[in-house]
């Protein structure tokens, strides 16, 4: 369910 381990619920928005 998690896109990024560092983000709670966000895709890679860098």
From Swiss-Prot:
Compartments it resides in: Secreted
Keyword Iron appears in the UniProt entry: no
Top-rank taxon, per record: Eukaryota
Primary localization: secreted
Keywords annotated in UniProt: Disulfide bond, Secreted
Record family assignment: Belongs to the CRISP family.
Remaining remarks: Negative results: does not show any toxic, hemorrhagic or edematogenic activities in mice. Does not degrade fibrinogen or azocasein. Does not induce platelet aggregation, or inhibit collagen, ADP thrombin or ristocetin-induced platelet aggregation. It is not yet known if this protein blocks ion channels.
Name this protein carries in UniProt: Cysteine-rich venom protein
């Amino acid at each position: 369910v998690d896109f990024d381990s560092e983000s709670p619920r966000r895709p890679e928005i860098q």
